[in-house]
Amino acid sequence: MAAAVAAAAAMRSRILQVSSKVNATWYPASSFSSSSVPTVKLFIDGKFVESKSDKWIDIHNPATNEVVGRVPQSTKAEMDAAVESCKRAFPAWADTSILSRQQVLLRYQQLIKENLKEIARLITLEQGKTLADAEGDVFRGLQVVEHACSVTSLMLGETMPSITKDMDLYSYRLPLGVCAGIAPFNFPAMIPLWMFPMAMVCGNTFLMKPSERVPGATMLLAKLLQDSGAPDGTLNIIHGQHDAVNFICDHPDIKAISFVGSNQAGEYIFERGSRNGKRVQANMGAKNHGVVMPDANKENTLNQLVGAAFGAAGQRCMALSTAILVGEAKKWLPELVDRAKNLRVNAGDQPGADLGPLITPQAKERVCNLIDSGTKEGASILLDGRRIKVKGYENGNFVGPTIISNVKPSMTCYKEEIFGPVLVVLETETLDEAIKIVNDNPYGNGTAIFTTNGATARKYAHMVDVGQVGVNVPIPVPLPMFSFTGSRSSFRGDTNFYGKQGIQFYTQLKTITSQWKEEDATLSSPAVVMPTMGR
């Protein structure tokens, strides 16, 4: 009993140390008692408000499975109020000068930098990833905010003077209206920051639904945006699960939806949202291959494979979850296993941790079942992380690094996205065989080749049907001056996230044909024939 009380006290102390801003908006100190946990607020019309819902979801620390908060399933009235707030704020925000919107984002990126470690600690508490990885989560989102500050160049229109005598043609980009975002659990800061800053700097207002498992980072980001001078109503936040998703897909005032998450959810949101006339972009699942050529730099390649496969406990849509060893590279497999063995599994806030827990007990069970399927279907488990025990965190959702060899493309552990710290290894004799395996897989998020031969790298990059290719880069996530260009079954929509594509997604073109006669503007007689423009 005493140990349980001490553990609870330690957890509360850790929460209260996260951030003074969080205490005011998400983890109020006064909410702690022996019988209560803090509740996540809604953010509507510039205010953090308590939900009136009678349906709540527990938020767990994945390292302990202790409840650290409760998030509401927003009521219909609350969700309607959030959209109405966005709708009211839109005309004035869209009419705000682009330089003023840019200034809000410039202040915002500075506040994110100043509070980066606080956001990261909150991510580690709710999501489980290591503090260093959580800081990277925030930083990659911050890069998109910094890129959004270039809006004055990104939103330039086009013009063509004198298409015929005294007639000019020009176009410019305008915001859509109310846009919405549905974010996953694995990047609590980065993915929301892919969405609302890009949309808002273009003049849209935004409705955000963070993952119900990790809402805290988004709430703190909302507070920082408010402190940056964003007007009330330009960003609203609701919480929930299926009802909230359906609400976003169906509401007539929402013009566009950004989604990142699983294929099942992404396909559903794309179909339902598109059916209701909305613009939808959906980043979904992946099976990312790393092709290792025998001429690759062995030390660098092995280290990069281990980091990309097991970092964030494999809970990345760009995790390198499949290695294809070509020719003599298969001899490197024992050394790959040795490096993976040396990774330290622990709670994310513990010094020296390389990877933390999975998000839920259900996620752990699913990953272990997929590992089991490998043995049942004839694969070999070279490194087994299913029975790992982490001292002091025995109730956590931990799976250690796992390597499965002798894998065939027909096996379940290859066909399904595992989303855990599991690397499946295939072997081929030639590069062409490896390319065929990659192209036969339905996903198209990312891939990498490891080689010291430029011709080999060029052939691979040009022949694989994958949206993002790394050459000696295991996780080729583009910086935000480019766009995130996953393809095939990893993406639905026709316009990708951030970069030029992101601006295009959140804007619409207006084209104006203008004629100002050199002579008197008054026509001497009406023109009744079909205008031919160029004659």
Curated annotation (Swiss-Prot):
One Gene Ontology MF term: methylmalonate-semialdehyde dehydrogenase (acylating, NAD) activity
Protein name: Methylmalonate-semialdehyde/malonate-semialdehyde dehydrogenase [acylating], mitochondrial
Residues at which NAD(+) binds: 183, 185, 209, 212-213, 262, 417
Gene from which this protein is expressed: Aldh6a1
Family: Belongs to the aldehyde dehydrogenase family.
NCBIfam families: MMSDH
Entry keywords, A to Z: Acetylation, Mitochondrion, NAD, Oxidoreductase, Phosphoprotein, Transit peptide
Subunit structure: Homotetramer.
Catalytic residues identified in the record: 317 (nucleophile)
CDD domains tied to this protein: ALDH_F6_MMSDH (cd07085)
Function text: Malonate and methylmalonate semialdehyde dehydrogenase involved in the catabolism of valine, thymine, and compounds catabolized by way of beta-alanine, including uracil and cytidine.
Cellular component terms (Gene Ontology): mitochondrion; nucleoplasm
